Amino acid sequence: MEKIQRICSLVLLAAFWGCVPVLHAQSFDKLWKQVEQAQEKSLPQTVIKLTDEIFRKGEREKNTPQMLKAYMCRNTYQNILTPDSFYVNLKGLEQWALHEQNPVSRAVLNSLVASIYANYADNNRWELRNRTSLNLGETALPADIREWSANLFVNQVIKYTGEALKDSTELLKTSSRTYIPFVILGDASEYYHHEMYHLLASRAIDALQKVSWFDTDSLVKKDIMGIYGQMINTYRKMPDREDAAVLTMLDYMAWRNREGDVLLRPRAVKEGESEAPNQYLRALDRIIKDYGKRDVCAEAYLAKARYYRNMRKYPEAVSYTHLRAH
């Protein structure tokens, strides 16, 4: 869907509690500058050494964001030098998430774990498709994920995305601004009041979509619909989140259309009707009716224009583009 640039691009997820003293921030900045120089010179061992130093410094000073950034950067270079370290680092991240006490920090960690499992499954899609499903409980999982079947990855992604969004109240109260520079605020971030709930919900949907290819029981699709539904209901109930509600509804409808869902299926023409009613267009019209005075509603007009263009109804497409321009 060609829409407003996505809200927050997560460079390295981290949790940031309170304000870090300027002296500490400068010290971390100096260390990260050295990391950048080592990266430019292709010195992975130096990067690992420096990020380990940053991690330990963050641990001493209880600076969670610096710990997370250093942890993820160090892991990346360890994985390059020693591929098997990927599996050890994943377990370490899971343990960190399990024992983290701060609810938002825990949500961030669970989101990271979910994405790692989803990316691994997506990158090994062909091999996993040819494996027989293993019906195993959580306690019976093989220690080596290289022995897992596709359904086990699906289960883990469902588990960790659920954990990431469990404390939605805290996420709604936490601004993604406090995560800068680990979160880059996109052009549309202000529409969501820069809160962490939408960021982690979007990441959860992305992770679930990556394993939807293996979902034979529609559990993933059900979870995605549930996340969208919860987001829409949440934003509709909040008096200052009309824009967030509009954008989330449009995202939801776009996803359902990509899934070939009922919204775009041809329906029987009733007697006296010139063409079959279309639920997708009706939904867009409802958004325009309810939120037409808001600037963000231009996205609904553009969605209608794209729909008519795809149906090769060019006069209608042009008319809605014209309406949007005004």
Task: List PLM regions with ranges.
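Bacterial Sec-dependent N-terminal signal peptides
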Residues: 1-28
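N-terminal leader/linker segments that initiate helical-solenoid repeat arrays
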Residues: 25-50, 64-65
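Structural register within alpha-helical repeat arrays
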Residues: 34, 74, 113, 204, ...
